[in-house]
């Protein structure tokens, strides 16, 4: 039976500034605060869907900032969405794509909210709209990004002993190449036999630097190298993939299905980091995964350091993937000092457990969010490197 149409009544975008538990140092920026971009869509039947379009480091990571995401949703997306049928998320998103260019993060936030509302309406978890779960939990890596070797080792020891994480991704690329390599090798030696070490360069190296470091990482048994060179250098990424003794993962080079197809056709990566926001939404991310699987490229569930909404939306989708060899890094809420859910996400025994309820399966603490929202608390703290 075709669902009775339900009008979208309102679309609200909220910026929420939350300090991090420690400085989070990337090659492009050092974050002391994360700005969550939340979207709340109210429907005529009383259902409320939520989504998130959070990015990293303001404008340091990509072409959308928290502020631009909010302005573009409020100014362009919201007026168009009001009055559309909320029971047809695909049709609503097709309308947006047909009229507006780019804005992948903004589109992702809106699409998540629409799918959350529709799954609630149907009384099923959001994952059911993408074929259903294959797993009820996902492995979660932890990112070590203080920039201090001793501190990173101590942090890894703590979360490992707490049975929260046993895979560690090291953010590197902001220091001299030899210093970065020494930092990684020291941590790998400290954790050897207990935890797996991977590195994320965030495009900071040249091709020759990546070759030099890759040989040393292979000798040290580092498991994975993420986006070592510029995203637009696909030919270089292919050369590294062909040469490397350590698997190469594409991240910033993946802006959706078209990039996934180009990279897969060129065999320019061993692994794809799938991110819902970077892919333009849940549907785009599902298509990226399908292309990877067809090309026999491994999958990894990436993060934009989202809060609970974006994190669990990602987990809902990743739970439907037939293959998720490299697990996920859906640790974003654990990096934040404030909890925005009435019941926190459950991280236990090295995995994130998916909730069983309808939609995203979470309940937001709107009183807390109102206290943290940008119009009552100013200032995301970002240091550019």
Swiss-Prot record:
The keyword Glycoprotein does not apply. The keyword Metal-binding applies. It catalyses: (S)-muconolactone = cis,cis-muconate + H(+). InterPro entries: Chloromuconate_cycloisomerase, Enolase-like_C_sf, Enolase-like_N, Enolase_C-like, Mandel_Rmase/mucon_lact_enz_CS, Mandelate_racemase_C, Mandelate_racemase_N_dom. Catalyzes a syn cycloisomerization. Homooctamer. This is Muconate cycloisomerase 1-2.
């Amino acid at each position: 039976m075709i669902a009775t149409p339900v009008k979208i009544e309102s679309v609200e975008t909220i910026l929420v500034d939350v300090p991090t538990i420690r400085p989070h140092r990337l090659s492009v920026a050092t974050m002391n605060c994360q700005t969550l971009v939340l979207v709340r869509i109210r429907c005529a039947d009383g259902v409320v869907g939520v989504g998130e379009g959070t990015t990293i480091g303001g404008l340091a990571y990509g072409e959308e900032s928290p502020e631009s995401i909010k302005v573009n949703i409020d100014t362009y997306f919201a007026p168009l969405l009001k009055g559309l049928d909320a029971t047809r998320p695909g049709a609503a998103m097709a309308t947006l794509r047909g009229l507006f260019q780019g804005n992948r993060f903004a589109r992702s936030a809106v699409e998540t909210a629409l799918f959350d509302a529709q799954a609630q309406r149907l009384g099923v978890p959001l994952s059911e709209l993408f074929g259903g779960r294959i797993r009820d939990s996902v492995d979660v890596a932890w990112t070590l990004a203080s920039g201090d070797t001793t501190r990173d080792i101590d942090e890894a020891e703590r979360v490992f002993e707490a049975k929260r994480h046993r895979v560690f991704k090291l953010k590197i690329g902001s220091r001299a190449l030899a210093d970065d390599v020494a930092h990684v090798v020291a941590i790998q030696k400290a954790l050897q036999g207990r935890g797996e070490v991977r590195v994320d360069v965030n495009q900071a190296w040249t091709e020759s630097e990546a070759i030099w470091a890759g040989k040393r990482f292979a000798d040290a048994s580092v498991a994975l190298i993420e986006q070592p060179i510029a995203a637009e250098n696909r030919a270089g990424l292919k050369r590294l993939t062909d040469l490397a003794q350590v698997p190469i993962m594409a991240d910033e080079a993946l802006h959706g299905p078209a990039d996934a197809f180009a990279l897969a056709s060129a065999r320019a990566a061993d692994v794809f980091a799938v991110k819902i926001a970077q892919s333009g939404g849940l549907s785009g991310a599902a298509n990226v995964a399908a292309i990877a699987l067809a090309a026999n490229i491994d999958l990894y569930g990436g993060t934009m350091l989202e809060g609970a909404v974006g994190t669990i939306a990602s987990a809902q989708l990743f739970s439907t993937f037939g293959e998720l060899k490299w697990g996920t890094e859906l640790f974003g809420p654990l990096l934040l000092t404030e909890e925005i859910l009435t019941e926190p996400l459950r991280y236990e025994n090295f995995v994130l457990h998916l909730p069983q309820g309808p939609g995203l399966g979470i309940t937001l603490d709107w009183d807390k969010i109102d206290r943290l929202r940008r119009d009552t608390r100013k200032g995301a703290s970002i240091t550019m490197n």
